[in-house]
Amino acid sequence: MYEIKRGGHADMKRIYPMLEHDFHEWERPSLADCHLGLIRGAELLLLKDESGLEAGYAYMLRDAARRYALLGWLAVYPTIRGAGTGAQFLELIKARYARYECVFIEVTEYPELEKARRLAGFYKRHGWCETGIPYAIGGRETLLLHRGEAPQRADLRGVLEAVYAPMYGPKF
C-alpha cells in the first residue's frame, strides 16, 4: 500500500537527477524553475510505501484559486516499474485532486512514439480524456488530456497559462 507525502526543496534537489533521467531536456523545467514553482504553490508529491521507502515522484502545477492542475512530471522508480505502482500512484493523485475542476496531463511526442501511445492509453484507462485541441511543447506534437470539467476551447490557453504561472510566471 502506498501513500503520498508532500516534498519540499531538499526533496526537489534530491530527486532532480531522476527527473533529468526520466524526461528530455526540452520537456523538463530547470531545477531553479522547480524551486520557484514550489515557492509559488506547485507541489512535489512523493510516493511512499508503508515502510517509508520512496517509490516515485510527481510534480504538480496548480491554479488553486480556479481549481485547475497539471500533472506535469510523474515517474515511478525503475526498480519497481511494471508492478502496478504507477496505477496506484495515479489513483492517489486523482483522490488528492478530486475537488479540482480539471486536472490536465500532457503526453509529449504523441502519436509519434510508441512509448507515448502506451502512456496515453494508460492515462485514458484511468479516466483521462483527450481535449481534442491541437497542442505542442517545444515544437513537438503533444496530446493534452483532461480529467474533470475541461474549460471551453476559447478559455483553455488562459487556464493553462495560469496553471504554469507558478513556475514560469513573472520573476521579480
Placement of each model-derived feature along the sequence:
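Short strand-connecting beta-turns/loops that link adjacent beta-strands
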Residues: 9-10, 50-53, 63-66, 138
